[in-house]
């Protein structure tokens, strides 16, 4: 009952008590937003630019990213920097991280925002993983790991570095099955929705474990449900499903609110390993996401998948 109630109640959150106007001055802060060319990511970049941050917009499509950068400059007067990143290819992930590290010594905030939802089952990552789990969890894990030197360089006891990972209310709907994330007979028995749920559950497990491992080194790691948001994530849904779902969806600027709160507010900076819910509130993820044994198992599995890349 608790998981079901959490899922349903977060579809209809109360009016926010925090807004982008409450974001502190971010002058001198270096930030990366994955999937920053569209939806919640783009709105996140917009708010960060408006408050003085130096923002790297990480995306797969250079054309779409540069269109977004041009539009955002018109709206804010500030220009984001394109960072080439395909989370579905671990080689591209390393290349993107190395490009960033060649330009910056410090990274103050990393928004692991990009995601794939309900992709067709025949879609796999470059290395043969389920596209959803590979993009949402494995790609972001590898990217975060490679950027740890810059995060640690930016982190101090009074100004901690932050890693904010976007999950969803889907984290309440299931747990992890380590046997279905690579193309296999076991995976073929699963539905796309189940694999999406696992990826969102995995986002929270990863975020909690990151806090557990690096909290003492002044890195804050939170995950969140951005809310029921109208974005490109729904591109794999049928027209009928899109139309039905549209009734319950909020605009992308609302979807950026909770991750901006997690990533910039003094309140969220006093916490670690938490799960945030719409709009800009502290919540609770599914209980299993906080299990240290599960966190350790997932972390070690992810390290094994990424070690050759």
UniProtKB/Swiss-Prot annotation:
InterPro entries hit by this protein: NAD(P)-bd_dom_sf, SDR_fam
Keywords: NADP, Oxidoreductase
Binding site for NADP(+): 64, 86, 113, 196, 200
Applications reported: Melleolide sesquiterpene aryl esters are cytotoxic secondary products with anti-cancer potential. Armillaridin shows therapeutic and radiosensitizing effects on human esophageal cancer cells. Armillaridin induces autophagy-associated cell death in human chronic myelogenous leukemia as well as of hepatocellular carcinoma cells. Armillaridin can also inhibit the differentiation and activation of human macrophages and thus might have potential to be developed as a biological response modifier for inflammatory diseases.
Entry EC number(s): 1.1.1.-
GO molecular function annotations of the record: oxidoreductase activity
A Pfam family annotated for this UniProt entry: adh_short
Note: Armillaria species are both devastating forest pathogens and some of the largest and oldest terrestrial organisms on Earth. They forage for hosts and achieve immense colony sizes via rhizomorphs, root-like multicellular structures of clonal dispersal. One genetic Armillaria gallica individual localized in Michigan's Upper Peninsula stands out as exceptionally large, covering hundreds of tree root systems over approximately 75 hectares of the forest floor. Based on observed growth rates of the fungus, the minimum age of this large individual can be estimated as 2500 years.
Known role: Short-chain dehydrogenase/reductase, part of the gene cluster that mediates the biosynthesis of melleolides, a range of antifungal and phytotoxic polyketide derivatives composed of an orsellinic acid (OA) moiety esterified to various sesquiterpene alcohols. The first step in melleolides biosynthesis is performed by the delta(6)-protoilludene synthase PRO1 which catalyzes the cyclization of farnesyl diphosphate to protoilludene.
Family to which the UniProt record says this protein belongs: Belongs to the short-chain dehydrogenases/reductases (SDR) family.
Protein name: Short-chain dehydrogenase/reductase ARMGADRAFT_1018437
Lineage: Eukaryota, Fungi, Dikarya, Basidiomycota, Agaricomycotina
